[in-house]
Amino acid sequence: MQKSLLAIAMASLLTPVSYLHAQEVQTNDTVVVTANRFEQPLAEVIASTTVISKQEIEETQAKSLLDVLKRVPGIEVSQSGGRGHSASVFIRGFNSNQVLFLVDGVRINSAAGGISFNHIPVGIIERVEVIKGPGGALYGSDAIAGVINVITTSSESSEGSVVSLGAGSDAQKEANFSTTRAFANGGVLKLAGGFEETEGFDIKDPETGLNYGYESQNLFASYSQAFNDEFSGSASVRWYDSLTEYDSGGKNYGYSENLSITADVQYSGSRLSSTLRANQQAIENLDYSQAEGKDNAGTVKKIALTNLQFLNQYLISEGITIGAGADWRKEKLDDDALSYGYPDKLAGESRSTTGVYLSTDLQLGDLQVTGSVRNDKHDTYDNYRTWSLGTRYQITESHSVRATFGTSFKAPSYSDLTNNPDLKPEEAMSREIGYTGEFALFTVDVAAYDNDVDNLIIWYEGSPWWYPENVDATLKGLEITGYFNTWFVHHTVVAEFKDHQDSGGNKLAKRADENYKWLMDASYENFDVNLTYTYTGERLGNPKEVSDPKNELPSVSLWDASVGYWISPDLVVRARVDNLTNEKYQTTLSYNAPERRYFANLTYQF
């Protein structure tokens, strides 16, 4: 019934009324850096790619990176509660930890566990680039499902400052600021910071009578300097900490702190472009009960990460580009690491990886071909070789077809190996074909994909503990995205159909077979309005070898809305309502999702 209502609503909009061309699809001036690790026009990227701009993030009033990502075609989000609680981001049905997560091109994934999508403050984000499909031949381990790159810097050097204050349901409060200053010598300084706190709500099912809150603080500073027309450099520091309340036989606390320092030097000549980048991260994760307290936390993990990159791209001639580069990464778990009050089995362990890659991009008239090969020397799993090949043919100015093929791998995490030291690395073979067509009234993109995964790591519910195992799996799907305008309203409509199962024929948990999205964005005079509809089909709650009705999450339809009113060119007031129809639902078994929530925000720029 819910899907029928959506179809009726869509049909009502497709009456012949003053259509505009769907301008948002892939604008010619949009530039991305993730697809080949250097800037290139989005129109020249073969892989399925979505770019979310700062303007879109602000207008939709996204409170977290999860709010940004759940609007992206092909992405499904699952969360164990509300703001700040653990979450998974599934790209085309792949595991959340099979996504390579970058901030300004630097890897954030840690072998100590999963990715925290909650800890990147949206206030410092300039744009988010999502590349779907294997990225192992350029980036190495973890990029099986794709790459998410959060960009916090901008090529624009315009000056300005922004201050925003917000409040909402569950006693949520937030404040953020940012300022950018451009200097006559070619330098650009950016400073930002903010805090957020909420009392939360009772996330457990059955309910415990307790609220589980969240609080965080963040600071960010960057400075870039153009030395001349060819050489430039930059340095940045990013810090955040957070405290999350969660349930584990009573109220428990998860504390995280992250410090990241990055510096790079870039050369951009008429033919050669090069980047030398270094990054150091210090990560601390604590888990403790009320009785233990923070100073006596039972689980303590401190991780030191070092990343070095040397990237090069050379234009041989018009339409022929080659790339080459090397990455070195080292990760060390502290000698005093604890797990549930006992010394961690992998305390003091370190792992390092050295990767080298070659790539090429050929433009042969209407035919474009890209390819890359990479070798990663892992100190535990020896050498892994990956490759990718992509091609696109421009049939006419408005119609094109594409195909991509590639391999990728992911090494087990520290947590995986602690619970099963015999685990093997995951390996995947991915295939995709696609079509993009621009018509008078709309633009459509269709992608069909087929992925085979060997040694997929799945955590199963055991007694008394969960445990990981290697299984083989296949993930197939069809992704259809349409763009069109009615008057001043821009529409994005997404339909996703997935077939995902392990070698025993069992569905993979938390992934629906069907997902639908309808995004409506409008700007009229002083108003910005956004309306989002998402439908998520039935799915398993936890991995099981046999079907169990108690293990199924029912389908759900959700509406979110936001509106902004510009009081003056410098002052805007915004309001947002999540879960307009107040649906009661879960995206993780035994964890309640938020009911209807209200937020308001006042932003002043000067």
Curated annotation (Swiss-Prot):
Location(s) in or outside the cell: Cell outer membrane
Membrane-topology descriptor: Multi-pass membrane protein
Example GO BP: monoatomic ion transport
One Pfam family linked to the record: TonB_dep_Rec_b-barrel
Keyword Mitochondrion (UniProt): no
A cellular component annotation (GO) from this entry: pore complex
Signal sequence bounds: 1-22
Domain of life: Bacteria
SUPFAM superfamilies xrefs: Porins
Span(s) of short sequence motif TonB C-terminal box: 589-606
One term of GO molecular function: ABC-type vitamin B12 transporter activity
Record-linked Gene3D superfamilies: TonB-dependent receptor, beta-barrel domain, TonB-dependent receptor, plug domain
Similarity section: Belongs to the TonB-dependent receptor family. BtuB (TC 1.B.14.3.1) subfamily.
Function statement: Involved in the active translocation of vitamin B12 (cyanocobalamin) across the outer membrane to the periplasmic space. It derives its energy for transport by interacting with the trans-periplasmic membrane protein TonB.
Protein name: Vitamin B12 transporter BtuB
Native species: Vibrio vulnificus (strain CMCP6)
